[in-house]
Amino acid sequence: MDRVLLKGALAELFDEGAARFDASMAELTTFRIGGPADVLVEPRTADEARVVLAACRRLGVAVRVMGLGSDVLVADEGLRCVVVRIAESLSQVEVDGERMHVEAGASNADVARRACEEGLAGYEFACGIPGTVGGAAVMNAGAYGGEFKDVAESVRCLTPEGELVDVDAERAQWSYRHSMMGEAGFVVLGATLRLAPDDPRAIRERMDDLARRRAEKQPLELPSAGSTFKRPAGFFVGQLGQEAGLRGYRVGGAQVSEKHTGFVVNAGGATAADVRRLIADVQERVRASAGVDLEPEVRMWGFEE
Protein backbone atom coordinates (compact mmCIF):
# COMPACT_ATOMS: atom_id res chain seq x y z
CA MET A 1 0.00 0.00 0.00
CA ASP A 2 1.35 3.41 -1.01
CA ARG A 3 0.57 5.21 2.25
CA VAL A 4 1.61 8.63 0.95
CA LEU A 5 -0.66 8.35 -2.08
CA LEU A 6 -3.52 7.03 -0.01
CA LYS A 7 -3.13 9.70 2.65
CA GLY A 8 -3.23 12.38 -0.01
CA ALA A 9 -6.34 10.90 -1.60
CA LEU A 10 -8.15 10.65 1.72
CA ALA A 11 -7.12 14.18 2.68
CA GLU A 12 -8.92 15.44 -0.42
CA LEU A 13 -12.07 13.58 0.57
CA PHE A 14 -12.33 14.13 4.32
CA ASP A 15 -11.62 16.67 7.01
CA GLU A 16 -8.30 16.36 8.81
CA GLY A 17 -8.46 13.59 11.38
CA ALA A 18 -11.29 11.68 9.68
CA ALA A 19 -8.75 9.07 8.55
CA ARG A 20 -6.43 7.57 11.17
CA PHE A 21 -3.21 5.74 10.42
CA ASP A 22 -1.89 2.79 12.45
CA ALA A 23 -5.19 2.63 14.33
CA SER A 24 -5.34 0.19 17.23
CA MET A 25 -7.83 -2.56 16.47
CA ALA A 26 -7.66 -3.83 20.04
CA GLU A 27 -9.56 -0.68 21.03
CA LEU A 28 -12.22 -1.30 18.39
CA THR A 29 -13.03 -4.99 18.88
CA THR A 30 -14.89 -6.62 21.74
CA PHE A 31 -12.13 -9.23 22.12
CA ARG A 32 -9.81 -6.29 23.00
CA ILE A 33 -7.18 -7.97 20.82
CA GLY A 34 -5.44 -7.12 17.57
CA GLY A 35 -2.62 -5.19 15.97
CA PRO A 36 -2.99 -1.87 14.14
CA ALA A 37 -4.80 -1.26 10.88
CA ASP A 38 -2.86 0.72 8.30
CA VAL A 39 -5.78 3.12 7.87
CA LEU A 40 -9.12 3.55 9.65
CA VAL A 41 -11.92 5.67 8.19
CA GLU A 42 -15.24 6.36 9.93
CA PRO A 43 -17.70 7.82 7.41
CA ARG A 44 -20.36 10.17 8.76
CA THR A 45 -22.81 9.77 5.89
CA ALA A 46 -23.75 7.11 3.38
CA ASP A 47 -22.25 9.29 0.66
CA GLU A 48 -18.91 9.46 2.52
CA ALA A 49 -18.91 5.67 2.74
CA ARG A 50 -19.55 5.45 -0.98
CA VAL A 51 -16.78 7.92 -1.77
CA VAL A 52 -14.11 6.26 0.37
CA LEU A 53 -14.93 2.80 -0.98
CA ALA A 54 -14.75 4.16 -4.52
CA ALA A 55 -11.37 5.77 -3.77
CA CYS A 56 -10.02 2.48 -2.46
CA ARG A 57 -11.23 0.66 -5.57
CA ARG A 58 -9.61 3.28 -7.78
CA LEU A 59 -6.30 2.96 -5.92
CA GLY A 60 -6.43 -0.83 -5.77
CA VAL A 61 -6.40 -0.80 -1.96
CA ALA A 62 -7.84 -3.69 0.06
CA VAL A 63 -10.79 -2.79 2.30
CA ARG A 64 -12.43 -4.35 5.34
CA VAL A 65 -15.78 -3.08 6.63
CA MET A 66 -16.70 -3.37 10.30
CA GLY A 67 -19.17 -2.07 12.83
CA LEU A 68 -18.55 -2.31 16.57
CA GLY A 69 -16.06 -5.16 16.18
CA SER A 70 -18.21 -7.66 18.04
CA ASP A 71 -17.62 -10.58 15.68
CA VAL A 72 -14.02 -9.97 14.59
CA LEU A 73 -10.65 -11.39 15.64
CA VAL A 74 -7.80 -9.28 14.27
CA ALA A 75 -4.34 -10.81 13.94
CA ASP A 76 -1.61 -9.63 16.30
CA GLU A 77 0.29 -8.28 13.28
CA GLY A 78 -2.65 -6.05 12.38
CA LEU A 79 -4.22 -5.33 9.00
CA ARG A 80 -2.53 -4.15 5.83
CA CYS A 81 -5.62 -2.48 4.45
CA VAL A 82 -8.13 0.30 4.92
CA VAL A 83 -10.74 -0.44 7.57
CA VAL A 84 -14.04 1.36 7.05
CA ARG A 85 -15.82 1.50 10.40
CA ILE A 86 -19.56 2.10 10.15
CA ALA A 87 -20.60 2.75 13.72
CA GLU A 88 -21.49 5.74 15.94
CA SER A 89 -20.92 8.36 13.24
CA LEU A 90 -23.53 6.71 11.00
CA SER A 91 -26.24 5.70 13.46
CA GLN A 92 -29.34 7.85 13.00
CA VAL A 93 -32.77 6.36 13.66
CA GLU A 94 -36.05 7.74 12.27
CA VAL A 95 -39.52 6.50 13.16
CA ASP A 96 -42.34 6.61 10.62
CA GLY A 97 -45.47 5.00 12.02
CA GLU A 98 -44.70 1.31 12.47
CA ARG A 99 -41.49 1.56 10.47
CA MET A 100 -38.01 2.43 11.71
CA HIS A 101 -35.42 3.70 9.24
CA VAL A 102 -32.07 2.88 10.79
CA GLU A 103 -28.55 3.71 9.65
CA ALA A 104 -26.20 0.73 9.66
CA GLY A 105 -23.97 1.98 12.46
CA ALA A 106 -26.75 2.10 15.06
CA SER A 107 -26.24 -0.50 17.77
CA ASN A 108 -28.83 -3.23 18.17
CA ALA A 109 -29.23 -2.25 21.82
CA ASP A 110 -29.97 1.39 20.96
CA VAL A 111 -32.47 0.43 18.28
CA ALA A 112 -34.26 -1.94 20.66
CA ARG A 113 -34.44 0.80 23.31
CA ARG A 114 -35.75 3.36 20.82
CA ALA A 115 -38.36 0.92 19.56
CA CYS A 116 -39.48 0.34 23.14
CA GLU A 117 -39.78 4.07 23.76
CA GLU A 118 -41.90 4.41 20.62
CA GLY A 119 -44.14 1.50 21.62
CA LEU A 120 -42.94 -0.68 18.74
CA ALA A 121 -42.45 -4.41 19.31
CA GLY A 122 -40.41 -6.97 17.42
CA TYR A 123 -36.78 -6.01 17.99
CA GLU A 124 -36.60 -7.08 21.63
CA PHE A 125 -34.66 -10.21 20.68
CA ALA A 126 -31.74 -8.00 19.61
CA CYS A 127 -31.52 -5.89 22.78
CA GLY A 128 -28.51 -7.85 24.02
CA ILE A 129 -26.89 -8.73 20.70
CA PRO A 130 -23.57 -6.87 20.50
CA GLY A 131 -22.92 -5.07 17.26
CA THR A 132 -24.78 -2.93 14.78
CA VAL A 133 -27.85 -3.14 12.61
CA GLY A 134 -25.56 -3.40 9.59
CA GLY A 135 -23.92 -6.49 11.03
CA ALA A 136 -27.29 -7.91 12.02
CA ALA A 137 -28.51 -7.51 8.45
CA VAL A 138 -25.48 -9.22 6.93
CA MET A 139 -25.48 -12.13 9.38
CA ASN A 140 -29.23 -12.36 10.01
CA ALA A 141 -28.48 -12.01 13.70
CA GLY A 142 -30.82 -13.72 16.07
CA ALA A 143 -31.45 -14.71 19.67
CA TYR A 144 -34.20 -16.19 21.82
CA GLY A 145 -36.40 -17.16 18.90
CA GLY A 146 -36.13 -13.91 16.94
CA GLU A 147 -34.08 -13.12 13.83
CA PHE A 148 -33.34 -9.98 11.86
CA LYS A 149 -35.26 -11.32 8.86
CA ASP A 150 -38.44 -11.39 10.95
CA VAL A 151 -38.63 -7.59 11.10
CA ALA A 152 -36.61 -6.38 8.10
CA GLU A 153 -38.52 -4.85 5.21
CA SER A 154 -35.52 -3.74 3.15
CA VAL A 155 -31.81 -3.02 3.40
CA ARG A 156 -29.93 -0.21 1.66
CA CYS A 157 -26.54 -1.33 0.37
CA LEU A 158 -23.56 -0.48 -1.77
CA THR A 159 -22.63 -3.13 -4.29
CA PRO A 160 -18.94 -3.97 -4.85
CA GLU A 161 -19.17 -1.77 -7.96
CA GLY A 162 -20.38 1.20 -5.91
CA GLU A 163 -24.04 1.13 -6.94
CA LEU A 164 -26.59 2.11 -4.29
CA VAL A 165 -29.38 -0.49 -4.13
CA ASP A 166 -32.34 -1.35 -1.91
CA VAL A 167 -32.55 -5.08 -1.19
CA ASP A 168 -35.95 -6.43 -0.22
CA ALA A 169 -36.49 -9.44 2.03
CA GLU A 170 -36.90 -11.88 -0.84
CA ARG A 171 -33.68 -10.83 -2.54
CA ALA A 172 -31.77 -10.78 0.76
CA GLN A 173 -32.13 -14.59 1.01
CA TRP A 174 -31.75 -14.60 4.78
CA SER A 175 -31.09 -17.91 6.48
CA TYR A 176 -29.22 -18.96 9.61
CA ARG A 177 -26.30 -16.49 9.97
CA HIS A 178 -26.32 -15.86 6.24
CA SER A 179 -27.53 -13.38 3.64
CA MET A 180 -27.04 -12.57 0.00
CA MET A 181 -25.38 -9.30 1.06
CA GLY A 182 -22.61 -11.11 2.89
CA GLU A 183 -22.19 -13.60 0.07
CA ALA A 184 -21.98 -10.89 -2.60
CA GLY A 185 -19.80 -8.44 -0.66
CA PHE A 186 -22.45 -5.73 -0.34
CA VAL A 187 -21.85 -3.00 2.26
CA VAL A 188 -24.97 -2.33 4.31
CA LEU A 189 -25.71 1.36 4.90
CA GLY A 190 -29.11 1.13 6.55
CA ALA A 191 -32.31 -0.82 6.97
CA THR A 192 -36.05 -0.32 7.23
CA LEU A 193 -37.68 -2.36 9.99
CA ARG A 194 -41.41 -3.10 10.14
CA LEU A 195 -42.50 -3.45 13.76
CA ALA A 196 -45.82 -3.79 15.60
CA PRO A 197 -47.45 -1.42 18.11
CA ASP A 198 -47.45 -2.57 21.73
CA ASP A 199 -47.43 -1.20 25.27
CA PRO A 200 -43.90 0.11 26.04
CA ARG A 201 -44.15 -1.41 29.53
CA ALA A 202 -44.77 -4.87 28.08
CA ILE A 203 -41.89 -4.43 25.65
CA ARG A 204 -39.59 -3.32 28.47
CA GLU A 205 -40.57 -6.35 30.56
CA ARG A 206 -39.64 -8.68 27.71
CA MET A 207 -36.32 -6.91 27.19
CA ASP A 208 -35.52 -7.05 30.91
CA ASP A 209 -36.30 -10.77 30.95
CA LEU A 210 -33.98 -11.41 28.00
CA ALA A 211 -31.24 -9.34 29.66
CA ARG A 212 -31.53 -11.42 32.84
CA ARG A 213 -31.39 -14.68 30.92
CA ARG A 214 -28.35 -13.51 28.96
CA ALA A 215 -26.52 -12.39 32.11
CA GLU A 216 -27.22 -15.72 33.81
CA LYS A 217 -25.91 -17.86 30.97
CA GLN A 218 -23.27 -15.84 29.12
CA PRO A 219 -19.82 -14.58 30.20
CA LEU A 220 -20.61 -10.90 29.73
CA GLU A 221 -17.97 -9.91 32.28
CA LEU A 222 -15.07 -10.91 29.99
CA PRO A 223 -14.05 -9.69 26.52
CA SER A 224 -15.26 -11.97 23.74
CA ALA A 225 -16.85 -11.94 20.31
CA GLY A 226 -20.09 -13.43 21.56
CA SER A 227 -21.00 -16.91 20.38
CA THR A 228 -17.79 -18.25 18.87
CA PHE A 229 -19.34 -20.90 16.64
CA LYS A 230 -22.42 -21.22 14.48
CA ARG A 231 -24.94 -23.70 15.81
CA PRO A 232 -24.74 -26.98 13.87
CA ALA A 233 -28.09 -28.45 12.88
CA GLY A 234 -29.45 -30.66 15.62
CA PHE A 235 -26.85 -29.71 18.24
CA PHE A 236 -26.04 -27.04 20.81
CA VAL A 237 -22.46 -25.80 20.81
CA GLY A 238 -22.36 -25.40 24.58
CA GLN A 239 -23.42 -29.01 25.11
CA LEU A 240 -20.86 -30.26 22.59
CA GLY A 241 -18.12 -28.32 24.35
CA GLN A 242 -19.18 -29.61 27.74
CA GLU A 243 -19.25 -33.23 26.54
CA ALA A 244 -15.78 -32.79 25.02
CA GLY A 245 -14.43 -31.69 28.41
CA LEU A 246 -13.61 -28.19 27.23
CA ARG A 247 -15.04 -26.07 30.06
CA GLY A 248 -12.23 -23.77 31.24
CA TYR A 249 -9.74 -25.09 28.65
CA ARG A 250 -7.02 -22.50 27.99
CA VAL A 251 -4.41 -21.55 25.45
CA GLY A 252 -2.38 -18.68 26.86
CA GLY A 253 -4.81 -15.95 27.85
CA ALA A 254 -7.67 -17.36 25.78
CA GLN A 255 -10.17 -19.60 27.52
CA VAL A 256 -13.30 -21.61 26.85
CA SER A 257 -15.73 -19.91 29.20
CA GLU A 258 -16.43 -21.58 32.52
CA LYS A 259 -19.96 -20.18 32.27
CA HIS A 260 -20.86 -21.23 28.73
CA THR A 261 -18.63 -23.53 26.67
CA GLY A 262 -19.89 -22.00 23.43
CA PHE A 263 -17.90 -18.85 24.18
CA VAL A 264 -14.17 -18.23 23.86
CA VAL A 265 -13.12 -15.35 26.09
CA ASN A 266 -10.08 -13.19 26.66
CA ALA A 267 -9.36 -14.21 30.24
CA GLY A 268 -6.49 -11.72 30.46
CA GLY A 269 -3.61 -10.91 28.15
CA ALA A 270 -4.77 -13.16 25.33
CA THR A 271 -3.23 -12.74 21.90
CA ALA A 272 -5.03 -13.31 18.63
CA ALA A 273 -2.77 -16.32 18.10
CA ASP A 274 -3.99 -17.74 21.44
CA VAL A 275 -7.62 -17.36 20.41
CA ARG A 276 -7.08 -18.82 16.96
CA ARG A 277 -5.25 -21.84 18.39
CA LEU A 278 -7.96 -22.35 21.00
CA ILE A 279 -10.69 -22.24 18.36
CA ALA A 280 -8.81 -24.87 16.34
CA ASP A 281 -8.40 -27.04 19.44
CA VAL A 282 -12.12 -26.82 20.21
CA GLN A 283 -12.97 -27.81 16.65
CA GLU A 284 -10.61 -30.79 16.83
CA ARG A 285 -11.87 -31.98 20.21
CA VAL A 286 -15.56 -31.69 19.28
CA ARG A 287 -14.94 -33.46 15.97
CA ALA A 288 -13.20 -36.28 17.83
CA SER A 289 -15.84 -36.63 20.54
CA ALA A 290 -19.06 -36.04 18.60
CA GLY A 291 -18.17 -36.19 14.91
CA VAL A 292 -19.46 -32.63 14.45
CA ASP A 293 -17.61 -29.92 12.52
CA LEU A 294 -17.96 -26.52 14.17
CA GLU A 295 -17.87 -23.46 11.91
CA PRO A 296 -16.58 -20.26 13.54
CA GLU A 297 -19.06 -17.41 13.71
CA VAL A 298 -16.26 -14.96 14.47
CA ARG A 299 -14.50 -13.51 11.42
CA MET A 300 -10.70 -13.81 11.45
CA TRP A 301 -8.86 -10.95 9.80
CA GLY A 302 -5.20 -10.61 8.90
CA PHE A 303 -4.07 -14.17 9.44
CA GLU A 304 -3.84 -14.92 5.75
CA GLU A 305 -1.88 -11.76 4.97
Question: How would you describe each model-predicted region?
Answer:
Residues M1, L5, A26, R44-D47, ...:
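Conserved active-site and cofactor/substrate-binding residues in soluble primary-metabolism enzymes
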Residues D2-V133, A143:
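Anion-binding (especially nucleotide phosphate/pyrophosphate-binding) glycine-rich loop
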Residues R20-F21, T29-T30, V72, L158-E305:
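Phosphate/pyrophosphate- and phosphate-bearing ligand-binding catalytic cores of soluble enzymes
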Residues D71-V72, A112-A115, Y123-C127, N140-E147, ...:
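A generic local secondary-structure boundary/capping motif
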Residues S91-V93, E153-C157:
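Short polybasic amphipathic segments
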